[in-house]
Amino acid sequence: MKLSIVEKIGFGAGDMAINVVIIAMQLLLAYFYTDIYGLSAADVGVLFVVVRMIDAIIDPAMGVLTDKLNTRWGRYRPWLLWFAIPFGFAVYLMFITPDMAYMAKLAWAYGTYILMTLVYTAITIPYISMIGVITSDPVERLSANGYRFVMTKIAAFLVTIVVPMLAVWLGQGNKALGYQFSMGLMGAMGALLFIFCFLTTRERSEPEITSLSVGKQFKYLLRNDQWIILGVVILLLMCGYVIRGSVAAYYAKYYLNGGDSLISPFLTTGVVASILAMIATTWITKFWDKIKMFRYTQIITFILSALMYFSVGRENLILAFAFYFLINFFCDMQMPVFWSSIAEAVDYGEKKTGLRVSGLAFGGILFFQKFGMGIAGGILGFLLSHFGYQADVEQTARSLTGIALMMTLIPALFHLAVGLLMKKYLINKEYYRDIQLALAQKQA
């Protein structure tokens, strides 16, 4: 089934809304909590781990719930409508900075972060499941994901450029108030984007949903070796992404000695590279095996990251920007491939086991994603504290070395592991065509 451009844009609008939050979490939240809200790096690390673990446990349950519930609007689309407004409100609350005692401020951070991640789960799992029901054509799925990830990078533009600028303009010297207002506007925009996604997309297929218990579904899911590979891959990717992305603001401000004014252009460089990567992937995968591209781009990311550590000094501003651009370009080329591969792995599991486990599979992938984010957040907080980071002061040589390591070599190891692991992933275009044929014969 061919999708119209309007529907592809509408589908992408949903992920644009999601990425207002996820980009803020990856690029700004650690910096916001330490340098603006005033939490210690160690407390931020523990916060990230605890909240992500809570959220990760809930993800599979949400996946099962989406499979059980069906409405006249479909199985997955209604969640976008129901949770659009709560999503926008939760974004706003997460960036409020009440003037309270330290422990009360920490409790507020826990409460609002947990609320945000729960709402995020309730809307994200149905959204990522939609790609399996709006079309069964793998080429159209990849194309829709191409639109989707270009729009995620537009969201990244807004978070890395517009939010800091609005924070200065709206805050009038009060950065905390500025971030509250600017992220409140992003939350409102996200709510509208979810409603637009709901209105412009359609669920066209009704996959067979199992009536088995969650425990039995889980046993079948664990027999899906390709799904397990994808789960470990997204965990490793998120470790690399979150560590590098979260420390980028510190790298620009302290290591490159650019202060607050360099944060926005440095982060934006990575966003531009990511947008170009989405466009390049859509073109390259027409001529080259998408799984090979996935694997090799992660190995290239490892090499570039290692070179950046040994080549870029504190005075090499242009070289730092160039390496950051290239790392983000090659690293992000895998995104459309990964997220279109989940639906294909679900089909693979159905062919292998005879049972289709969809909602739990998508929820499980988000479990791995958030587990990786939690691990990365813990590593980030621990290392910032270990290397002696202190907010808004001149950093020691030790803390600067730590920031440089978190920007380059440490995430590089995770990307190398992904590149090696993807050699075990089997479902390329030809393999998936055979899966579709086998499933079609089964249903005939």
Language-model features, listed with the residues they occupy:
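Membrane-embedded alpha-helical bundles of multi-pass transporters/translocases
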Residues: 1-444
